């Protein structure tokens, strides 16, 4: 018998122990028996595999109570189901693919006890790789896009958790933090692709009164992590795409760990989709047959006005979008797919990734309120920026270094060195960065802690729409961004290419804030 379907809004668990960690949240109309029926599409346990490739399910939610989210997160390598296959040697959190979603509100405290239980069956090194072997057991956590401290027990990338080690991540979400989709994932340099590519990632959603309003209107809110999965030739061992088997044509394109799930809508229904490109390197050009999207937020930050009638959505690795989808009145099956995209070196093929099934009675619900205006962002293009706060960040490729080896990719002429800081920025200032790309491929550029505003692409001004933490720097081109340092001193604050193998090969650097 198939386990009972559990809607994300219902799946908030009270005192339920999941893979060695206690999930503390308020139960929402579920008995204990109902709660333990975890949809298999999350990769939770082998006996639930029958639900793979069926209706889209979402990872279980760990929700804050009384202003605090307290939970255990265990990173391990126990086999899980991925896209309907039993996968050996994943790297998952709490045995789930994707990991549990952390659901918090501005002002909440996040208190995670993180345990490293990574065990690989086979020794595996790559000669000349110049970075840790893929079987290294060291790991940590990065809270991608979250505007929290880069030091201490928060988003500190110098923290390393060794095998069988533990780390407490304890920090507060600022009271003025924007509502939207963020994520957490492994971030040890040299191992990022290997761990994230095998599943070490989960979503974070920051909710506020705007989120509550959408819920009261009866509008369904779906969270979707878009991923690629690669398997060895025997189709059982999950591997990453860091040179082991990195042909985009061989990847399984997954949503919430499922292969070609069904997304159900009623005729005329409005839904909100929060989308995360949680892949290590893929560029997704998302298209829904017969429908258009309305974009209301990018990288967890609301736009100043919605982008309507968008036939496609472009998401590079690490990017998020929140979109409104309105089903048309014609019942039937519509394909959600990726258009082909030429990144310069890799070409990501056209692929169907889900079926949207429109059926049943016509939907009766409220109108979506549009963009969230509770946390407005400032247009930095009009700010006065002195010459000394204009900086250049050069993304380059050293062709003398073989493909796959450390030093292949660089920023400002050098590969990642944790002891080298580019500069120290001053709290309260606005800086302008020219980010150049002299390589033959597009690079998604990501900055930790502080979002930025793109003001130019290839020297041409860009109209103000909002702030983001990932932006594509076009091949042989540039972007110009501005960023304001409003909180948090210290560091390190990292910036890097979010093609994670490029980061692992050196395209990352750091700065501090004082």
Region spans (language model):
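Extended terminal and domain-junction accessory segments
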Residues: 14, 26, 31-72, 76, ...
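Histidine- and aromatic-rich segments of cupredoxin/plastocyanin-like copper-binding domains
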Residues: 150-155, 160-162, 230-375, 462
């Amino acid at each position: 018998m198939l386990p009972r379907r559990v809607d994300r809004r219902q799946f908030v668990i009270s005192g339920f122990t999941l893979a060695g960690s206690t999930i503390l949240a308020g139960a929402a109309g579920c008995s204990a028996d109902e709660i333990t029926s975890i949809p298999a599409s999350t990769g939770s346990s082998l006996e639930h595999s029958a639900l793979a490739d069926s209706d889209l399910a979402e990872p279980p939610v760990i929700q804050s109570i009384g202003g605090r989210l307290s939970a255990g997160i265990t990173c391990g390598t126990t086999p899980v189901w991925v896209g309907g296959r039993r996968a050996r040697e994943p790297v998952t959190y709490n045995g789930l693919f994707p990991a549990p979603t952390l659901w918090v509100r501005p002002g909440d405290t996040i208190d995670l006890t993180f345990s490293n239980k990574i065990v690989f069956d086979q020794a595996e090194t790559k000669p000349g790789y110049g970075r840790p072997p893929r079987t290294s057991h060291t790991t940590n956590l990065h809270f991608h896009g979250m505007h929290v401290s880069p030091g201490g027990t928060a988003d500190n990338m110098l923290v390393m958790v060794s095998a069988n080690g533990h780390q407490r991540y304890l920090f507060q979400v600022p009271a003025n933090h924007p509502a939207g989709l963020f994520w957490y994932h492994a971030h040890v340099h040299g191992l990022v692709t290997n761990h994230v590519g095998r599943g070490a990632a989960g979503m974070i959603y920051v909710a506020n009164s705007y989120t509550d309003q959408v819920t009261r209107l009866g509008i369904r809110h779906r969270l979707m992590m878009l991923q690629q999965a690669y398997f060895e030739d025997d189709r059982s061992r999950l591997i990453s795409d860091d040179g082991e088997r990195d042909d985009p044509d061989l990847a399984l394109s997954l949503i919430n760990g499922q292969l070609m799930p069904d997304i159900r809508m009623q005729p005329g229904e409005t839904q909100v989709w929060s989308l995360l490109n949680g892949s290590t390197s893929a560029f997704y050009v998302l298209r829904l047959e017969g429908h258009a999207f309305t974009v209301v937020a990018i990288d967890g930050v609301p736009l100043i006005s919605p982008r309507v009638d968008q036939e496609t959505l472009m998401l590079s690795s690490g990017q998020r979008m929140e979109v409104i989808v309105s089903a048309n009145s014609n019942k039937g099956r519509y394909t959600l797919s990726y258009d082909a995209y030429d990144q310069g070196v890799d070409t990501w093929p056209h692929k169907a990734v889900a079926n949207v099934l429109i059926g049943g009675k016509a939907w009766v619900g409220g109108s979506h309120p549009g963009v969230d205006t509770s946390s407005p962002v400032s247009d930095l293009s009009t700010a006065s920026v002195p010459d000394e706060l204009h900086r250049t960040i050069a993304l380059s490729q050293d062709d003398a270094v073989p493909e796959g080896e450390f030093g292949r990719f660089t920023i400002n002429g050098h590969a990642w060195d944790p002891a080298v800081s580019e500069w120290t920025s001053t709290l309260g200032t606005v800086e302008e960065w020219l980010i150049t790309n002299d390589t033959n491929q597009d690079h998604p550029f990501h900055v930790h802690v502080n979002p930025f505003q793109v003001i130019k692409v290839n020297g041409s001004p860009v109209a103000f729409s909002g702030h983001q933490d990932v932006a594509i720097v076009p091949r042989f081109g540039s972007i110009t961004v501005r960023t304001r340092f409003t909180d948090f001193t210290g560091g390190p604050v990292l910036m890097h290419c979010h093609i994670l193998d490029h980061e692992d090969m050196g395209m990352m650097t750091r700065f501090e804030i004082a």
